Amino acid sequence: MLLASNVTAKEKDSAFVPFLFSTETLGLSVGVAGVAKGVWQPQAALFGMGLYSDKDSYIGFLSAYNYALTDRLLFSTQLYQAKLNQAPYYIGNQGNNGSSIEGKSIVDGFEENYKLEFKFLLPWGVIKDDGYMGMFKPQRDSSFASPIDSGVTSISLIPFYTSRKLSKAISSDETAKGIRLALDWDNRDSTRNPTKGSHTELTFSMGSESWANEEIWNQIELQNSQYFSLGSLGGIFEQQVLAFDFYTADTPSWNRCDESLTCVRPPEHEQVSLGGLYRLRSYTGGRYHGRSAIHYSAEYRMLPEWQPLGSIPVINYYDLPWWQWVAFVDVGRVAEEYDLKTLHTDMQWSVGGAVRLQVEGVVVRAEVAKGSEESLFRVMINQPF
């Protein structure tokens, strides 16, 4: 049994959670997050989050997921805006693999990130039998090693606009307008808590500041995740999973330079980077950036038999069917060339632990990670991979 109490909350169509926390970057922050499911369509969802800090910083995030435009075309969007006062940024050589944390710039930043996603589902695997609702099954068959027979295969077109403005004229304002093409095969048995299968995504990106008088920069990214069930462990763990993730990226246009040594490169906030919510998790977002990167993650995920959350007042108002303990390690590095020997030399690392739980159908993760430079605590939604 995952729930220790007979008094369980029924999963609701909407839920809102206030929060209060303090970090060195943001200061003392207060905010609220909310999710609404089945808005206009049963498989669709809205998610929003906003916070304000005593440093006069703010973050706003709004997203809409999985709205069916046709029987095989889904639409999603994400809108992000943040004003970060006296925040750390790693500009220019400050973001190289050999750079030091002491070289960071503490400045005021204004960030924007807006994107639309049009996802076309190929008539293979579960889509062939169940249509687009097949991708929302809580459990899926992942026993076949071919996208024709198993999983969800999709092609996504993702227009995006991003910008970053920093104070004190440390760097010029940077803007990127572009488009991504993503080829995705999701062959996991579950998207919220996978125990077996795999997930592979190949992404091509291209962009420019204006698309008028500038050359177009381009990037290639490949990510592959694998999951292996270890079964239960006596009366301690109901479920054990080993999860592995591999990521690599390159910017082919990086060394395409003119006579004035102006090169066709993305702005720094769009460069291949490590650090943040998904890779090298003990480092701030964009800590390392450059032309190329390679990164490996390994996680040991445990679902304990002991589940006290359903019997705790206030908390048991929310639907909490499971919680998960996680130990993880990340290693990776960026480089100014795509060379496997270079990318596997002097790699950066992170180790950490996390508690994850499903709240009203959304996976929430709280994790602490430590690296050679710093330690970070974060709370975010969704599994990292």
Which functions belong to the PLM regions below?
Residues 5-78, 85-89, 104, 150-158, ...:
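Outer-membrane beta-barrel initiation region
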Residues 5-14, 128-149, 310-320:
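Outer-membrane beta-barrel biogenesis signature
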Residues 16, 44-48, 73-79, 153-157, ...:
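Transmembrane beta-strands of outer-membrane beta-barrel proteins
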Residues 21-23, 51-53, 78-82, 121, ...:
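Outer-membrane beta-barrel pore domains and translocons
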Residues 50-121, 235-277, 287, 342, ...:
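Outer-membrane beta-barrel translocator/channel fold
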Residues 80, 86-243, 335:
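Transmembrane beta-strand segments of outer-membrane beta-barrel domains in Gram-negative
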Residues 120, 181, 353-359, 374-385:
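Outer-membrane beta-barrel "beta-signal"
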Residues 179-315:
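C-terminal outer-membrane beta-barrel translocator/porin domains of Gram-negative envelope proteins
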